[in-house]
Amino acid sequence: MKTIEDSNYTIVINKSKFICELLYINNQDEIDSKLKDIKHKYKGATHYCYAYIYDNNKRFNDDGEPGGTAGMPILNVLENNNLNHVLCVVIRYFGGIKLGAGGLVRAYTKSVTSCLENTKIIDKKECQLIKITF
């Protein structure tokens, strides 16, 4: 299983600031608390778009951006890199210039891709603990 070490990366595109947070998740129960922490850390952001993959469970959210322009591109990058047990949140501070649907897809994709380029990828082996008593 390929996963990541926690990391973040910031880019500015047409005056909008995009902050990508990549987070390792141990279980699905962590997702809501990590999202809450990020919203607290980046108060006042315009959007908190995210996607996660945990085993066979995948989900994304556009958080008010036009449908399919934020969460799905984030998820696509995670899937294309065969990552698992990962939550990716891209925080956007609107800079006053509308990017259009295509521009948003490119911006969110670039944000996650740039963050991944600066993130340590970990190859985890799944093991089972077997206890034998005599």
Regions found by a protein language model. Give the residues of each.
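C-terminal regulatory domains involved in ligand/effector binding and gene-expression control
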Residues: 1-69
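Glycine- and acidic-rich phosphate- and metal-coordinating loops
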Residues: 52-53, 84-94
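Positively charged, aromatic-enriched nucleic acid-contacting surfaces
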Residues: 56, 66-83
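Short Cys/His-based metal-binding microdomains
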Residues: 99
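N-terminal cationic and glycine-rich segments that engage phosphates or anionic surfaces
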Residues: 107
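Short glycine-/aliphatic-rich beta-strand segments at the starts of folded cytosolic domains
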Residues: 122-134
